[in-house]
Amino acid sequence: MRVFIINAYEDRKEKYDDERYEIFPAFWWEDIEEEQVAEYHFRHNARLDYRKKVVACSLSHQAVLGKIINEDLKDVFILEDDAIIEKWDRLKELKGCKEFCYIGGQINAPLMKDFKKFEDIKDSVRENFCKGINVIDPKEFRLAHACGYFIPNKRVAQDILSNIPNCKKERAIDTEYISLQKKGKITKFIYPAIATLYLPEAKKGFSYSTYKLLDDQWLY
């Protein structure tokens, strides 16, 4: 078992002093070239620094998947550096899982235009979740964010990588994963979340304004 933290900011390392975490150096956004940015799809009014951060994040996640493939790693947990694991004993709940499984994130409406309406029914959606591994129903909800997920082996990592991008131009990594939910390639999440947000850091993230992070997402 390995637990990788995709770490971009030096000052975020201090909360990962537990030796069970392994720091995976992220791509730094200022090193991203405009030619790389051009390969991605963005809203027309997205700022260049935001675009570079999205690309750096995506490349970092794909690099971890590549490491799993190249080194034939098994039972790998991938977290972003604004997420933490508080109950390590829960990792054993993934024992025997043979596919991609979210261990953290945020449930959202199937369509972005319904984001605000979904907030009113989110609790009723959660009532259908059971403790343990659940199945994503893309017609009812989607799982956003890529703050924490489980990859059991290199076959699954390769399957994910080979399906990115889903369209002609690549999207943010969590958007790519949402597309794979719709295709039935990503179908599982564990409830409640194992990886929760460390809000002081999460609220500084470049996607905060999009997702309005109000809690640690223990209940997604």
Could you tell me what each predicted segment is?
Residues 1-79, 83-220:
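An acidic/histidine-cluster motif and surrounding catalytic segment
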